[in-house]
Amino acid sequence: MKNQLNEITSKLVFAIALGCLSQTVKAEPFHWNAFDLKVSPKNVGPLLALLDETFAAPDKPFKVTLSETIFSDNDVTHGLTVSSADVDAISALMSDEFKDGREQFMANLYQLAEVKSKYTGVRTFTTNIPEKGSDAKKAGSYFGHWEIEIKAADAPQFIESFKNVVSATKDLRTNHILGMGMFQFGKGKSTHYILHSFNSYSDLKKGLEAYSQKEAMAVHFKTIKEIATPVGSQVFKIIKQW
């Protein structure tokens, strides 16, 4: 893995760990570090160019994803995430060995974007796992993302109810990803998240309507109403994944 990381370093500057199929729920966890960004329209192109040049190596032990925020209750315009099933890959990115390159990358990033927040977590469950892994995301796809607060003692009950929903709604998903994960640091009251992929904006709107017609959803919401508190939601569109 060290040789792979050294190869990436030589491209421009070293990549930073920023801040970091079946129709049944599967455990193929991966770790991720994320930045919420505010990028002016004139800097979107240069940001893409920076990421293209930095993360061009094809055999990285991690993925880097840039997304555009479509709907949210804040002024974040883009999201940047580094993810890997191998936590050591992300750890290596953050090590002193690559300190100089990491700081140079950050300096370049700060010239193009305002960093609104940094946080880290782990995806614990994913359905319809893509061929390239649980963290693979297709350019142009939309994702609905819901943040919730759950007390640790109530998490098993929530997860069990979530699994029931997945089983009861599998007919609504063909190539769609439905996942659940945990925030570990940097997200305030939010402890868990649910996300769902959609092929287009129309697919998103029609998909949400289809879910609302399922009895399993009503049962789920009744089950979790005393143990899960909604914190926020957003829709984002994948620009590119390296």
Residue ranges of model-derived segments:
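Bacterial N-terminal signal peptides that target proteins for export
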Residues: 2-13
